[in-house]
Amino acid sequence: MSSAATNHPFSVPRYPSGQTCPAASEHLLVTQGAGQEERDALAAQLGKVRITHLALPDFPSVADLQLVLSTTLKDARVGLRLDLRGDEAFVWPLHALARAAGLLADEIFMSSSPEGTRLVFCVHCATCQPATSAGHLTCTQCGVMLEVRRHFSQRLGAYLGVCADADQPYQGVQP
């Protein structure tokens, strides 16, 4: 057994590509962008399986999309496969909504790119905030300079942000 640290920590999500579930009786595709190419590719892979597509640009807000998704999942039957595509700040709240609606983790496929927005949880004030993939940021709530750790909470859908310098937690912040 090697004592070397792994390059990819266990808690950091991995997003496999191209995995469809041909055994599913219905697919629900939710995309952050228009997603027409993704829908067409999925339809080509699955053949005659029913695909419902919800695209964020078709809704006035993320909250409206979440409401429609929640209603759709409430009426869902066994055999549904949920496919979420977008950045981490988009897919993880939808993942939580789907889990709360009763879907199992194996019934949810997520695809995300590391370049998009992600959520960071500040351990000092318990605020979840959108952030880029940068390693440091200033908390929007408490003003502490945070180091973003390579630890991801699936429950929160966020990375852990801790004080970057305990000796000067408010460096760069003007009183």
Curated annotation (Swiss-Prot):
Coiled coil: none
InterPro entries named in the record: DmmA-like_C
Superkingdom of origin organism: Bacteria
Subunit structure of this chain's protein: The heme-dependent oxidative N-demethylase (HODM) is a heterotetramer composed of a catalytic alpha subunit, a FMN/2Fe-2S-dependent oxidoreductase beta subunit, a gamma subunit with putative aminotransferase activity, and a delta subunit of unknown function.
Role description: Component of the heme-dependent oxidative N-demethylase (HODM) enzyme, that catalyzes the NADPH-dependent oxidation of dimethylamine (DMA) to methylamine (MA) and formaldehyde. Functions in bacterial methylated amine catabolism, linking alkylamine oxidation to the tetrahydrofolate C1 pool. The function of the delta subunit is unknown.
Name of protein: Heme-dependent oxidative N-demethylase delta subunit
